[in-house]
UniProtKB/Swiss-Prot annotation:
UniProt catalytic activity: tRNA(Asx) + L-aspartate + ATP = L-aspartyl-tRNA(Asx) + AMP + diphosphate
Site (Important for tRNA non-discrimination) location in chain: 32, 84
Gene designation: aspS
Binding site for L-aspartate: 177, 223, 447, 488
Protein known as: Aspartate--tRNA(Asp/Asn) ligase
InterPro entries in UniProt: Aa-tRNA-synt_II (IPR004364), aa-tRNA-synth_II (IPR006195), aa-tRNA-synth_II/BPL/LPL (IPR045864), Asp-tRNA-ligase_1 (IPR004524), Asp-tRNA-ligase_1_N (IPR047089), Asp/Asn-tRNA-synth_IIb (IPR002312), AspRS_core (IPR047090), GAD-like_sf (IPR004115)
Highest taxon in the source lineage: Bacteria
Cysteines engaged in disulfide bonds, as pairs: none
Keyword Nucleotide-binding: yes
Functional summary from the UniProt entry: Aspartyl-tRNA synthetase with relaxed tRNA specificity since it is able to aspartylate not only its cognate tRNA(Asp) but also tRNA(Asn). Reaction proceeds in two steps: L-aspartate is first activated by ATP to form Asp-AMP and then transferred to the acceptor end of tRNA(Asp/Asn).
Self-association and partners: Homodimer.
Similarity comment text for this entry: Belongs to the class-II aminoacyl-tRNA synthetase family. Type 1 subfamily.
Protein's cellular compartments: Cytoplasm
CDD domains, A to Z: AspRS_core, EcAspRS_like_N
Amino acid sequence: MKYRTHRCNELSLSNVGERVRVSGWVHRYRNHGGVVFIDLRDRFGITQIVCREDEKPELHQLVDSVRSEWVLSVEGTVCRRLEGMENANLATGDIEVEIEKVDILSKAKNLPFSISDDHIHVNEELRLEYRYLDMRRGQILDRLIYRHKVMLACRQYMDKQGFTEVVTPVLGKSTPEGARDYLVPSRIYPGSFYALPQSPQLFKQILMVGGLDRYFQIATCFRDEDLRADRQPEFAQIDIEMSFATPDDLFPIIEQLVVEMFSVQGIKIDLPLPRMTYQEAKDLYGTDKPDLRFGLQLRDCREHAKQFSFSIFLDQLAQGGTIKGFCVPGGADMSRKQLDVYTEFVKRYGAMGLVWIKKQENGLASNVAKFASEEVFDAMFADFSAKDNDILLLIAAPESIANQSLDHLRRLIGKERNLYNESQYNFVWITDFPLFAKEEGKICSEHHPFTSPLDEDISLLDTDPLSVRSSSYDLVLNGYEIASGSQRIHNADLQNKIFSILELSPESIKEKFGFFIDALSFGTPPHLGIALGLDRIMMVLTGAEGIREVIAFPKTQKAADLMMNAPAEIMTSQLKELNIKVTS
């Protein structure tokens, strides 16, 4: 049996009179007084099928029994629709197929939610449980097809640039990379475990040691971490590494890759992309992931704050904190109620409160008006280039809290006041990150321990490691980090030094990274790399609310697969085979 001669989007007036066969799902079903209409849907489109009781009574009885989402194969003749009955919204809207034979290929149970009315809101957990039905609603499939085209464009471009796609192992060794590993017990080596890769980091660097020169891979990675809207326990990244190159060699390649990926959707990206250091981003936007679609840049107000008799300002200055904020053009229309909402909002991020100062035609209004002279406020307005009807929003807090609070407030106000267009795509390279950070009193890597320090800062490793900058870079799009990379350490002695600063003992270094240090000791070329988060890029490109909307079979925010009911308990015999005992 041949299931189809045409797809459901292909028939047109040029096919009138032809005998055809189409197959698909019953999208909609209508019985209009002895005439049954079926919208038959496949991945490509919809074709209207018609069966008239007075012409084919037995066939009509069979067709009248079908229900939504049954799978049919229909044979019939293409006819022009009656005048006035055309549907301009369908590629096949000028024709219909008069049914002559129908095969019911598969029946469907009662549906947990409507498929034909894809505008109806459906609970996300229900959608994930019945992901295969959710796909039929169209939007998920469209995004998966778009994702395929983006991946295809990526592969074609990387091949032209001389990169070789290499598939690296999924079963590897557990090495500290920041997040928890997913572990796989070994049956052959009792008590030993593989780790699923958080990234192909060490493998791709060893490929450079092996002389591959230019590598890429669309890799699946795994991280056992707390999830957010833009995080999943398994995710895809476009992984890239190249030898004998500097960031200035890499950036144009990645920028053109971005152009190729976005051109799939017909989006034009202007090159070169702007660059900004980590410190500049923190100073101007409070974050290393700035959204550049709108202004509201931060300004340091410490010099002005010294002229206030406001104890919160003076206390922060005495404790080494900061006072900074931004100007909202036309923001003097914010009510006290709205400002109270913003005050409670910034408290979520550790701020004690929000200072607001309105520049009005008849003077100023502020919750700190009595703590400074008119001249001080005028100087502040001038510093912010504030005009009448603008408002200054300030926070006094330790630097990290002020930055985090203002970053979130800035994003919120930008969205609420429609300061940007959702179809804008503003990229920026963020460079020169700190090499180290301090967490819970311990030094840790800002990115990962294989990142090279800037040459001019290497001398500070012994005296002031927290001030050392790294040769690292992130690519940020509309406030999302979509790529991250760095120049790698290619010297075994320097790599050992970094490990020792991270308080890894010689025994621990040998146990976890001995193979890697050994590889670096056999003549390693200077090399660098980057990884682009494919899921996150697709999320931004499609306007999806989260990366679950661009992944075929995603997990929930609790890392559960509701469709397969995973994770799940396994049989006692399997545990015994793996020499594992579950204690709780």
